[in-house]
Amino acid sequence: MNKRFQGKVAVITGAAQGIGRRVAERMAAEGGRLLLVDRSELIHELADELVGVAEVLTLTADLEQFAECQRVMAAALERFGRLDILINNVGGTIWAKPFEHYQEREIEAEVRRSLFPTLWCCHAALAPMIEQGSGAIVNVSSVATRGIHRVPYGAAKGGVNALTACLAFETAERGIRVNATAPGGTEARHGGFRNSAEPSEQEKVWYQQIVDQSLDSSLMKRYGSIDEQVEAILFLASDAASYITGITLPVAGGDLGCQSCSVMFSVSG
């Protein structure tokens, strides 16, 4: 097997399940030394599975809090002595409904879930990467920056895209690359709503409209697999992408998300 990450130290957030878990499994198999973070205790089960495969440290943390992100990066430095790769994978739609139906607390919760963990972790990772003169950051965004029933989530992920571009400008000459992937609809075991309430019949209809739009927007007319998302993340994190920084790569079967709007405006202008 290719050992693209031999000896590299990577922090992977949101690693207990889904895309983050598969990234961790693949990096471990390819020689990475990993600090895996999630708010769920399931993260420790993954560490047990990777015993004998890679050197792994797991932490539970609420990465919506600035201090927790600082604690995670400090733990990585204490254990491994350096930080080569950061994969920011925390986020996800909590509610799915037209914007006028959101309450203030729900809007704030969506932004806090899908923007702040990435913002805080990028900030916390900068000092060791700048000191080393190298590093690769991959932020997991979304093509949902253009779509229905997820305006606060789309705004948060739009912030991730802007963070990616701006931070790449600031850090490129210091040897740090910053990129993002923008997944489209993706088959996952834990899809759908991410709040504890039982969805109403109307909420189920709204969510199905998101699914239908995702399929209609994709040229391939299907959902992607977790492995298809992971391949893009691993590529951007690896040395094979050494001349790539500041991009948000749509991985959505041809759906470009908000980038399609930018292309349209630039052509018409």
UniProtKB/Swiss-Prot annotation:
Listed binding positions for substrate are 142
Residues the entry annotates as binding NAD(+): 11-35
Task: Specify the superkingdom.
Answer: Bacteria
Record InterPro entries = BenD, NAD(P)-bd_dom_sf, Sc_DH/Rdtase_CS, SDR_fam
Q: In which pathway does it act?
A: Aromatic compound metabolism; benzoate degradation via hydroxylation; catechol from benzoate: step 2/2
The record's keywords, sorted A to Z, are: Aromatic hydrocarbons catabolism, NAD, Oxidoreductase, Plasmid
Q: Which SUPFAM superfamilies match?
A: NAD(P)-binding Rossmann-fold domains
Catalytic function, reaction form: (1R,6S)-1,6-dihydroxycyclohexa-2,4-diene-1-carboxylate + NAD(+) = catechol + CO2 + NADH
What GO biological process, any one, is recorded here? Answer: benzoate catabolic process via hydroxylation
| The enzyme's E.C. designation | 1.3.1.25
One GO MF term attached to the UniProt entry: 1,6-dihydroxycyclohexa-2,4-diene-1-carboxylate dehydrogenase activity
Which Gene3D superfamilies does this entry report, sorted A to Z?
NAD(P)-binding Rossmann-like Domain (3.40.50.720)
Q: Where is the active site?
A: 153
Q: What is the protein's quaternary organization? A: Homodimer.
Report the sequence similarity comment from the record.
Answer: Belongs to the short-chain dehydrogenases/reductases (SDR) family.
The protein's role, per its UniProt record: Degradation of 2-hydro-1,2-dihydroxy benzoate (DHB) to catechol.
For this entry, the protein name equals 1,6-dihydroxycyclohexa-2,4-diene-1-carboxylate dehydrogenase
Provide the species name: Pseudomonas putida
Classification from the root reads: Bacteria, Pseudomonadati, Pseudomonadota, Gammaproteobacteria, Pseudomonadales
Q: Which gene encodes it?
A: xylL
